[in-house]
Amino acid sequence: MADLLLECLIQKMFCLISFKEASKMSILSKSWLQAWSTLPNLEFFVNCWQGWVAHINIVDTIMERYGKGKIPIEKFELSVFFADSTQLFPLIDKWLLVALQNGVKELILHFTSYPAPILTILAEKSLRELVLHDCTLMPVSLSSGVVSCNSLRKISLSYVTLDENMLQTLFYSCPFIVSFLLEYCSGLTMKHIKIKSDSLKVLKIHQYCGIWEIEAPDLVSLDYTGNEIPVLNIARESSQ
């Protein structure tokens, strides 16, 4: 019990410092190494500089260990800046699956043109926050067997490619979403785009397309940048 408590305390301390600093401190003792080896927060940044193959192999080794050991993952952040990113897609799919299977709560992906498997992501029942940057969301219609992600509370999409059906799918699949950010995304071509959510409290839209209609009776914060003033409906209908 004492060893487990010590490991938990060390892990909490590791979460307060950078990944690089935590790796250096892992050599202090077996307890520190064990805590380092089971960190719940994983953050990986891969650049297309010399030695990138070794970096990819390190990430792959770590994710295989987490997968085989079923080590819980609370946060998984992956940022890849690579010229020919498509060759890494199979690896990204594999790492993402490990994170989802291990109960990830916060998922952050920054990867140019990566076709994020959104239905697989939304099927994860423990996910609370989803942040996508530069990714592509596969076209999905409401008739495609969309799952409900009742745990998801926050979605942030920046420079993501998606269409109107995907936007509606996200709100339809996440009935308890509280915060939503849509920033300079492409693919939204309809002249009239509507956002409807009974749970949404914080909404940020930085887009220069479409005439927005926002129906969110619980909305308390709106940050909007666009060509048209949105139509707001924030009055809750009377039950009488």
Predicted segments with their positions:
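Leucine-rich repeat
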Residues: 1-189, 194
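Acidic, glycine-rich loop-and-beta core segments that form the ion-binding/anion-interacting portion
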Residues: 197, 203-240
